[in-house]
Protein backbone atom coordinates (compact mmCIF):
# COMPACT_ATOMS: atom_id res chain seq x y z
CA UNK A 1 0.00 0.00 0.00
CA UNK A 2 1.36 3.47 -0.81
CA UNK A 3 2.22 5.51 2.27
CA UNK A 4 0.77 8.98 2.70
CA UNK A 5 2.85 11.45 0.71
CA UNK A 6 4.79 14.09 2.56
CA UNK A 7 3.18 17.53 2.32
CA UNK A 8 4.53 19.96 -0.23
CA UNK A 9 6.57 22.79 1.22
CA UNK A 10 7.23 26.39 0.33
CA UNK A 11 9.52 26.58 -2.64
CA UNK A 12 13.27 26.44 -2.15
CA UNK A 13 16.26 27.73 -4.04
CA UNK A 14 16.87 25.70 -7.20
CA UNK A 15 19.57 23.14 -6.43
CA UNK A 16 21.28 23.13 -9.83
CA UNK A 17 21.55 26.75 -10.89
CA UNK A 18 24.43 29.17 -10.70
CA UNK A 19 22.22 31.61 -8.82
CA UNK A 20 21.74 29.23 -5.89
CA UNK A 21 24.87 27.15 -5.18
CA UNK A 22 24.05 23.57 -4.28
CA UNK A 23 26.59 23.44 -1.48
CA UNK A 24 25.06 26.21 0.64
CA UNK A 25 21.65 26.80 2.13
CA UNK A 26 21.24 30.49 1.36
CA UNK A 27 20.48 32.45 -1.78
CA UNK A 28 22.93 35.17 -2.84
CA UNK A 29 21.80 38.71 -2.39
CA UNK A 30 23.23 42.19 -2.04
CA UNK A 31 23.83 42.55 1.66
CA UNK A 32 22.85 39.71 3.98
CA UNK A 33 22.02 36.16 2.99
CA UNK A 34 18.36 35.35 2.69
CA UNK A 35 16.90 32.13 4.10
CA UNK A 36 17.06 29.00 1.95
CA UNK A 37 13.30 28.48 1.88
CA UNK A 38 12.16 31.76 0.38
CA UNK A 39 9.96 32.13 -2.63
CA UNK A 40 12.63 33.35 -5.04
CA UNK A 41 16.33 34.15 -5.35
CA UNK A 42 17.04 37.75 -6.35
CA UNK A 43 18.77 37.86 -9.70
CA UNK A 44 20.68 41.08 -8.93
CA UNK A 45 20.50 43.84 -6.37
CA UNK A 46 17.24 43.88 -4.44
CA UNK A 47 14.29 41.68 -5.28
CA UNK A 48 11.69 43.16 -7.62
CA UNK A 49 7.97 42.63 -6.99
CA UNK A 50 7.72 41.51 -10.61
CA UNK A 51 10.23 38.69 -10.10
CA UNK A 52 8.31 35.47 -10.83
CA UNK A 53 8.14 32.84 -8.13
CA UNK A 54 9.93 29.57 -8.93
CA UNK A 55 7.64 26.59 -9.30
CA UNK A 56 6.53 24.77 -6.16
CA UNK A 57 8.22 21.39 -5.60
CA UNK A 58 6.01 18.54 -6.70
CA UNK A 59 4.04 16.68 -4.01
CA UNK A 60 5.81 13.59 -2.70
CA UNK A 61 4.99 10.49 -4.77
CA UNK A 62 3.59 7.26 -3.30
CA UNK A 63 6.02 4.71 -1.89
CA UNK A 64 6.81 1.80 -4.22
CA UNK A 65 8.21 -1.56 -3.13
CA UNK A 66 11.38 -2.62 -4.96
CA UNK A 67 12.05 -6.36 -4.49
CA UNK A 68 15.40 -6.16 -6.35
CA UNK A 69 14.92 -9.44 -8.19
CA UNK A 70 17.71 -11.40 -9.86
CA UNK A 71 18.09 -10.40 -13.50
CA UNK A 72 19.37 -12.40 -16.48
CA UNK A 73 22.86 -11.72 -17.76
CA UNK A 74 23.75 -8.05 -17.94
CA UNK A 75 20.16 -6.86 -18.34
CA UNK A 76 19.52 -3.47 -16.72
CA UNK A 77 16.87 -3.37 -14.01
CA UNK A 78 13.52 -2.43 -15.63
CA UNK A 79 12.38 -0.78 -12.39
CA UNK A 80 15.33 1.62 -12.55
CA UNK A 81 14.72 2.26 -16.25
CA UNK A 82 11.11 3.17 -15.49
CA UNK A 83 11.98 5.50 -12.63
CA UNK A 84 14.77 7.24 -14.52
CA UNK A 85 12.36 7.93 -17.36
CA UNK A 86 9.15 8.77 -15.48
CA UNK A 87 9.94 9.43 -11.79
CA UNK A 88 13.64 10.30 -11.41
CA UNK A 89 13.32 11.13 -7.70
CA UNK A 90 11.04 8.46 -6.29
CA UNK A 91 10.10 6.98 -2.91
CA UNK A 92 10.85 3.28 -2.40
CA UNK A 93 10.84 0.50 0.16
CA UNK A 94 13.49 -2.26 -0.01
CA UNK A 95 13.30 -5.92 1.16
CA UNK A 96 14.72 -5.34 4.67
CA UNK A 97 14.62 -2.71 7.39
CA UNK A 98 11.97 -0.13 8.17
CA UNK A 99 10.34 2.84 6.50
CA UNK A 100 10.88 4.26 3.04
CA UNK A 101 13.62 6.19 1.24
CA UNK A 102 14.09 8.50 -1.69
CA UNK A 103 15.78 6.99 -4.75
CA UNK A 104 17.67 9.33 -7.11
CA UNK A 105 18.29 7.88 -10.58
CA UNK A 106 19.48 10.57 -13.00
CA UNK A 107 23.16 11.29 -13.58
CA UNK A 108 23.30 14.98 -12.59
CA UNK A 109 21.07 14.44 -9.55
CA UNK A 110 23.24 11.54 -8.35
CA UNK A 111 26.39 13.66 -8.72
CA UNK A 112 24.66 16.44 -6.78
CA UNK A 113 23.58 14.25 -3.85
CA UNK A 114 26.93 12.45 -3.56
CA UNK A 115 28.93 15.68 -3.46
CA UNK A 116 26.65 17.92 -1.35
CA UNK A 117 27.54 17.94 2.38
CA UNK A 118 23.87 18.29 3.30
CA UNK A 119 23.51 14.55 2.64
CA UNK A 120 25.22 12.63 5.44
CA UNK A 121 26.27 9.00 5.66
CA UNK A 122 27.28 9.38 9.29
CA UNK A 123 23.68 9.97 10.36
CA UNK A 124 22.69 6.55 9.02
CA UNK A 125 24.62 4.83 11.83
CA UNK A 126 22.28 3.30 14.39
CA UNK A 127 19.15 4.26 12.48
CA UNK A 128 16.67 1.68 11.20
CA UNK A 129 16.26 2.31 7.46
CA UNK A 130 14.90 0.34 4.54
CA UNK A 131 17.80 -1.64 3.13
CA UNK A 132 19.06 -4.35 0.77
CA UNK A 133 20.25 -6.88 3.31
CA UNK A 134 19.56 -8.02 6.90
CA UNK A 135 22.89 -6.81 8.36
CA UNK A 136 25.38 -4.15 7.20
CA UNK A 137 28.51 -5.34 5.38
CA UNK A 138 30.72 -2.77 7.11
CA UNK A 139 30.87 -1.41 10.63
CA UNK A 140 28.65 1.64 11.08
CA UNK A 141 30.94 3.08 13.74
CA UNK A 142 34.35 2.73 12.06
CA UNK A 143 35.85 2.74 8.59
CA UNK A 144 35.10 5.02 5.65
CA UNK A 145 31.60 4.00 4.67
CA UNK A 146 29.51 5.60 7.41
CA UNK A 147 31.49 8.74 8.26
CA UNK A 148 31.54 12.29 6.95
CA UNK A 149 34.34 14.86 6.75
CA UNK A 150 36.44 15.77 8.67
CA UNK A 151 36.70 12.29 10.19
CA UNK A 152 36.26 10.72 6.75
CA UNK A 153 39.10 12.88 5.41
CA UNK A 154 41.42 11.69 8.20
CA UNK A 155 40.67 8.00 7.58
CA UNK A 156 40.84 8.29 3.81
CA UNK A 157 44.24 9.96 4.05
CA UNK A 158 45.61 6.91 5.89
CA UNK A 159 44.29 4.37 3.36
CA UNK A 160 45.42 6.51 0.42
CA UNK A 161 49.03 5.87 1.43
CA UNK A 162 48.63 2.31 0.15
CA UNK A 163 47.04 3.36 -3.17
CA UNK A 164 49.88 5.50 -4.49
CA UNK A 165 51.18 5.36 -8.04
CA UNK A 166 54.34 3.74 -6.70
CA UNK A 167 52.43 0.95 -4.99
CA UNK A 168 50.38 0.25 -8.13
CA UNK A 169 53.57 0.18 -10.24
CA UNK A 170 54.99 -2.32 -7.77
CA UNK A 171 51.80 -4.40 -7.84
CA UNK A 172 51.19 -4.48 -11.60
CA UNK A 173 54.11 -6.79 -12.57
CA UNK A 174 53.03 -9.19 -9.82
CA UNK A 175 49.48 -9.08 -11.18
CA UNK A 176 50.64 -9.68 -14.76
CA UNK A 177 52.74 -12.64 -13.66
CA UNK A 178 49.84 -14.12 -11.68
CA UNK A 179 47.44 -13.74 -14.64
CA UNK A 180 49.91 -15.45 -16.99
CA UNK A 181 50.36 -18.35 -14.55
CA UNK A 182 46.61 -18.82 -14.16
CA UNK A 183 45.99 -18.78 -17.92
CA UNK A 184 48.85 -21.23 -18.47
CA UNK A 185 47.05 -23.52 -16.05
CA UNK A 186 43.82 -23.13 -18.00
CA UNK A 187 45.62 -24.00 -21.23
CA UNK A 188 47.00 -27.15 -19.62
CA UNK A 189 43.51 -28.12 -18.42
CA UNK A 190 42.26 -27.83 -21.99
CA UNK A 191 39.09 -26.57 -23.60
CA UNK A 192 36.34 -26.06 -22.68
CA UNK A 193 37.22 -24.36 -19.41
CA UNK A 194 35.54 -22.11 -16.86
CA UNK A 195 37.15 -18.67 -17.01
CA UNK A 196 35.68 -17.78 -13.60
CA UNK A 197 37.38 -20.78 -12.01
CA UNK A 198 40.72 -20.32 -13.75
CA UNK A 199 41.08 -16.51 -13.85
CA UNK A 200 38.38 -14.21 -12.52
CA UNK A 201 38.01 -16.05 -9.21
CA UNK A 202 41.63 -16.64 -8.14
CA UNK A 203 43.24 -13.58 -9.76
CA UNK A 204 41.64 -10.81 -7.65
CA UNK A 205 42.25 -12.80 -4.48
CA UNK A 206 45.90 -13.28 -5.42
CA UNK A 207 46.33 -9.55 -6.08
CA UNK A 208 44.47 -8.74 -2.87
CA UNK A 209 46.72 -11.13 -0.97
CA UNK A 210 49.79 -9.31 -2.28
CA UNK A 211 48.28 -5.88 -1.62
CA UNK A 212 46.79 -6.53 1.82
CA UNK A 213 49.35 -9.08 2.93
CA UNK A 214 47.21 -12.23 3.23
CA UNK A 215 49.11 -15.50 3.47
CA UNK A 216 48.76 -17.97 0.59
CA UNK A 217 47.31 -20.68 2.82
CA UNK A 218 44.48 -18.38 3.97
CA UNK A 219 43.26 -17.49 0.46
CA UNK A 220 40.34 -19.94 0.29
CA UNK A 221 39.04 -19.00 3.74
CA UNK A 222 39.04 -15.34 2.72
CA UNK A 223 37.14 -16.18 -0.47
CA UNK A 224 34.45 -18.14 1.41
CA UNK A 225 33.82 -15.44 4.00
CA UNK A 226 33.72 -12.79 1.28
CA UNK A 227 30.91 -14.63 -0.50
CA UNK A 228 28.91 -15.00 2.74
CA UNK A 229 29.53 -11.39 3.73
CA UNK A 230 27.77 -10.15 0.58
CA UNK A 231 24.89 -12.62 0.42
CA UNK A 232 21.52 -10.89 0.31
CA UNK A 233 18.82 -13.56 0.59
CA UNK A 234 16.17 -13.60 3.29
CA UNK A 235 17.80 -16.71 4.80
CA UNK A 236 21.30 -15.23 4.82
CA UNK A 237 21.18 -13.08 7.96
CA UNK A 238 22.89 -15.49 10.39
CA UNK A 239 25.38 -16.65 7.75
CA UNK A 240 26.30 -13.03 7.02
CA UNK A 241 26.68 -12.27 10.75
CA UNK A 242 28.97 -15.27 11.21
CA UNK A 243 31.00 -14.22 8.16
CA UNK A 244 31.31 -10.67 9.51
CA UNK A 245 32.61 -11.95 12.85
CA UNK A 246 35.06 -14.35 11.17
CA UNK A 247 36.31 -11.63 8.82
CA UNK A 248 36.89 -9.15 11.63
CA UNK A 249 38.75 -11.75 13.71
CA UNK A 250 40.95 -12.77 10.77
CA UNK A 251 41.85 -9.18 9.86
CA UNK A 252 42.46 -8.21 13.49
CA UNK A 253 44.94 -11.08 13.76
CA UNK A 254 46.68 -10.00 10.55
CA UNK A 255 47.04 -6.43 11.83
CA UNK A 256 48.46 -7.64 15.15
CA UNK A 257 51.14 -9.58 13.26
CA UNK A 258 51.94 -6.58 11.04
CA UNK A 259 52.79 -4.43 14.06
CA UNK A 260 55.82 -6.64 14.56
CA UNK A 261 56.77 -7.24 10.90
CA UNK A 262 56.88 -3.67 9.47
CA UNK A 263 55.88 -4.67 5.92
CA UNK A 264 54.87 -2.17 3.21
CA UNK A 265 51.49 -3.69 2.35
CA UNK A 266 48.07 -2.27 3.27
CA UNK A 267 47.95 -4.24 6.52
CA UNK A 268 51.31 -2.72 7.46
CA UNK A 269 50.07 0.80 6.68
CA UNK A 270 46.94 0.31 8.80
CA UNK A 271 48.79 -1.40 11.66
CA UNK A 272 51.32 1.45 11.90
CA UNK A 273 48.59 4.09 11.78
CA UNK A 274 46.75 2.33 14.62
CA UNK A 275 49.93 1.89 16.66
CA UNK A 276 50.73 5.60 16.30
CA UNK A 277 47.22 6.66 17.31
CA UNK A 278 46.15 8.07 13.93
CA UNK A 279 43.25 5.62 13.79
CA UNK A 280 41.69 3.17 16.23
CA UNK A 281 42.05 -0.61 15.99
CA UNK A 282 38.35 -0.85 15.05
CA UNK A 283 38.84 1.70 12.27
CA UNK A 284 41.86 -0.23 10.95
CA UNK A 285 39.86 -3.47 10.80
CA UNK A 286 36.90 -1.80 9.07
CA UNK A 287 39.15 -0.14 6.50
CA UNK A 288 40.73 -3.51 5.67
CA UNK A 289 37.28 -5.12 5.32
CA UNK A 290 36.27 -2.43 2.83
CA UNK A 291 39.31 -3.23 0.71
CA UNK A 292 38.62 -6.97 0.94
CA UNK A 293 35.07 -6.53 -0.33
CA UNK A 294 35.96 -4.14 -3.15
CA UNK A 295 39.26 -5.80 -4.02
CA UNK A 296 38.18 -9.43 -3.96
CA UNK A 297 34.54 -10.34 -4.41
CA UNK A 298 33.56 -7.23 -6.37
CA UNK A 299 36.51 -7.42 -8.80
CA UNK A 300 35.82 -11.13 -9.39
CA UNK A 301 32.26 -10.48 -10.47
CA UNK A 302 32.78 -7.17 -12.26
CA UNK A 303 35.70 -8.45 -14.33
CA UNK A 304 33.77 -11.61 -15.17
CA UNK A 305 30.86 -9.46 -16.36
CA UNK A 306 33.26 -7.39 -18.47
CA UNK A 307 34.59 -10.50 -20.17
CA UNK A 308 31.05 -11.78 -20.73
CA UNK A 309 30.19 -8.42 -22.33
CA UNK A 310 33.17 -8.70 -24.68
CA UNK A 311 32.44 -12.32 -25.57
CA UNK A 312 28.86 -11.37 -26.45
CA UNK A 313 30.10 -8.41 -28.54
CA UNK A 314 32.55 -10.17 -30.89
CA UNK A 315 33.15 -7.07 -33.03
CA UNK A 316 34.33 -5.18 -29.95
CA UNK A 317 36.53 -8.10 -28.94
CA UNK A 318 38.09 -8.26 -32.40
CA UNK A 319 38.77 -4.53 -32.32
CA UNK A 320 40.61 -4.84 -29.00
CA UNK A 321 42.76 -7.59 -30.49
CA UNK A 322 43.66 -5.31 -33.40
CA UNK A 323 44.03 -2.15 -31.29
CA UNK A 324 45.41 -3.14 -27.87
CA UNK A 325 46.20 0.51 -27.14
CA UNK A 326 42.42 1.02 -26.88
CA UNK A 327 42.23 -1.18 -23.76
CA UNK A 328 42.21 1.54 -21.04
CA UNK A 329 39.40 3.39 -22.82
CA UNK A 330 37.49 0.15 -23.37
CA UNK A 331 37.78 -0.69 -19.67
CA UNK A 332 36.25 2.68 -18.73
CA UNK A 333 33.30 2.07 -21.04
CA UNK A 334 32.89 -1.44 -19.66
CA UNK A 335 32.74 -0.05 -16.11
CA UNK A 336 29.91 2.22 -17.25
CA UNK A 337 28.10 -0.44 -19.25
CA UNK A 338 28.23 -3.40 -16.85
CA UNK A 339 25.57 -3.44 -14.08
CA UNK A 340 28.02 -4.19 -11.30
CA UNK A 341 25.55 -4.72 -8.47
CA UNK A 342 21.95 -5.41 -7.54
CA UNK A 343 19.92 -2.58 -6.09
CA UNK A 344 21.66 0.18 -4.18
CA UNK A 345 24.45 0.66 -1.66
CA UNK A 346 24.79 2.83 1.44
CA UNK A 347 22.15 5.55 1.93
CA UNK A 348 22.50 9.12 3.12
CA UNK A 349 20.38 11.27 5.43
CA UNK A 350 19.39 14.81 4.47
CA UNK A 351 20.53 17.21 7.21
CA UNK A 352 18.21 19.98 6.01
CA UNK A 353 15.49 20.51 3.43
CA UNK A 354 16.98 20.22 -0.07
CA UNK A 355 15.33 20.25 -3.48
CA UNK A 356 16.54 17.54 -5.88
CA UNK A 357 15.10 17.06 -9.34
CA UNK A 358 11.98 19.07 -8.50
CA UNK A 359 11.24 17.11 -5.30
CA UNK A 360 11.61 18.53 -1.81
CA UNK A 361 13.64 16.17 0.36
CA UNK A 362 13.02 16.96 4.02
CA UNK A 363 15.64 17.05 6.75
CA UNK A 364 15.90 13.53 8.18
CA UNK A 365 14.77 11.77 4.99
CA UNK A 366 16.75 8.74 3.77
CA UNK A 367 18.23 9.04 0.25
CA UNK A 368 19.70 6.33 -1.99
CA UNK A 369 21.61 6.92 -5.22
CA UNK A 370 21.14 4.56 -8.18
CA UNK A 371 24.58 4.57 -9.80
CA UNK A 372 23.43 1.89 -12.26
CA UNK A 373 20.63 4.10 -13.54
CA UNK A 374 22.92 7.14 -13.68
CA UNK A 375 25.37 5.20 -15.86
CA UNK A 376 22.54 4.50 -18.32
CA UNK A 377 21.08 8.03 -18.27
CA UNK A 378 20.62 9.11 -21.92
CA UNK A 379 21.04 12.76 -20.89
CA UNK A 380 24.66 11.98 -19.97
CA UNK A 381 25.38 9.01 -22.28
CA UNK A 382 23.63 9.06 -25.68
CA UNK A 383 22.44 5.60 -26.71
CA UNK A 384 23.27 4.38 -23.18
CA UNK A 385 22.48 0.70 -23.77
CA UNK A 386 25.15 0.45 -26.48
CA UNK A 387 28.71 -0.62 -25.71
CA UNK A 388 30.72 2.16 -27.39
CA UNK A 389 34.50 2.40 -27.06
CA UNK A 390 34.44 5.74 -28.92
CA UNK A 391 32.08 7.43 -26.49
CA UNK A 392 33.03 11.07 -25.86
CA UNK A 393 31.83 11.16 -22.25
CA UNK A 394 33.46 8.53 -20.03
CA UNK A 395 32.88 10.11 -16.60
CA UNK A 396 30.84 7.16 -15.30
CA UNK A 397 29.75 6.68 -11.69
CA UNK A 398 30.67 3.02 -11.24
CA UNK A 399 33.04 4.04 -8.42
CA UNK A 400 30.70 6.63 -6.96
CA UNK A 401 31.37 10.36 -6.81
CA UNK A 402 32.37 13.01 -4.31
CA UNK A 403 34.18 12.38 -1.00
CA UNK A 404 33.17 8.70 -0.98
CA UNK A 405 34.52 7.96 -4.48
CA UNK A 406 36.07 4.49 -4.27
CA UNK A 407 39.74 4.65 -3.25
CA UNK A 408 40.36 1.22 -4.78
CA UNK A 409 39.31 2.42 -8.26
CA UNK A 410 42.94 2.71 -9.36
CA UNK A 411 43.55 -0.93 -8.45
CA UNK A 412 40.29 -2.15 -10.01
CA UNK A 413 41.20 -0.46 -13.30
CA UNK A 414 44.65 -2.01 -13.26
CA UNK A 415 43.27 -5.49 -12.57
CA UNK A 416 40.66 -5.23 -15.35
CA UNK A 417 43.30 -4.13 -17.86
CA UNK A 418 45.66 -6.92 -16.81
CA UNK A 419 43.01 -9.66 -16.99
CA UNK A 420 41.51 -8.63 -20.32
CA UNK A 421 44.92 -7.96 -21.87
CA UNK A 422 46.26 -11.32 -20.71
CA UNK A 423 43.27 -13.20 -22.14
CA UNK A 424 43.51 -11.44 -25.51
CA UNK A 425 47.23 -12.24 -25.72
CA UNK A 426 47.11 -15.83 -24.50
CA UNK A 427 43.89 -16.92 -26.24
CA UNK A 428 43.34 -14.86 -29.41
CA UNK A 429 40.51 -17.17 -30.54
CA UNK A 430 38.68 -17.28 -27.18
CA UNK A 431 34.88 -17.54 -27.41
CA UNK A 432 31.95 -18.73 -25.34
CA UNK A 433 31.54 -22.51 -25.18
CA UNK A 434 27.76 -22.22 -24.66
CA UNK A 435 25.05 -19.87 -25.95
CA UNK A 436 25.05 -16.57 -24.00
CA UNK A 437 21.70 -17.29 -22.36
CA UNK A 438 23.11 -20.50 -20.85
CA UNK A 439 25.83 -18.70 -18.88
CA UNK A 440 24.80 -18.94 -15.22
CA UNK A 441 24.95 -15.77 -13.14
CA UNK A 442 25.13 -15.24 -9.38
CA UNK A 443 21.83 -15.25 -7.50
CA UNK A 444 20.73 -13.46 -4.32
CA UNK A 445 23.93 -11.48 -3.97
CA UNK A 446 24.68 -7.78 -3.83
CA UNK A 447 27.33 -7.93 -6.55
CA UNK A 448 26.26 -9.20 -9.98
CA UNK A 449 28.46 -11.41 -12.14
CA UNK A 450 28.76 -14.81 -13.81
CA UNK A 451 28.89 -17.84 -11.56
CA UNK A 452 30.60 -19.75 -14.36
CA UNK A 453 31.93 -18.57 -17.73
CA UNK A 454 32.49 -21.57 -20.05
CA UNK A 455 34.92 -20.74 -22.86
CA UNK A 456 36.75 -22.53 -25.62
CA UNK A 457 39.51 -21.56 -28.07
Which residue ranges define each predicted feature?
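Cytochrome P450
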Residues: 1-20, 27, 37-457
Amino acid sequence: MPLDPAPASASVCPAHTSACPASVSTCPSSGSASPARVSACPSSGSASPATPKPPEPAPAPPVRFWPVDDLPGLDPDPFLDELSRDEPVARIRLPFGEGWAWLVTRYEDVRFVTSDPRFSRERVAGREVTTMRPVPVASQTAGLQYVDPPRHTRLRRVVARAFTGRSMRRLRPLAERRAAELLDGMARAGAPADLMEHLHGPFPLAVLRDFLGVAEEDRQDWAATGEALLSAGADSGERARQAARATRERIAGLLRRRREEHREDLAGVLARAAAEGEITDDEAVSLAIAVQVSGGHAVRNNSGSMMYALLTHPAHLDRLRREPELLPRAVEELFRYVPHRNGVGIPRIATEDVEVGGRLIRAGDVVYNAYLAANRDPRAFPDPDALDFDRDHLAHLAFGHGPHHCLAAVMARMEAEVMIGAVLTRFPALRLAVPPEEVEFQRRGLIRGPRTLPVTW
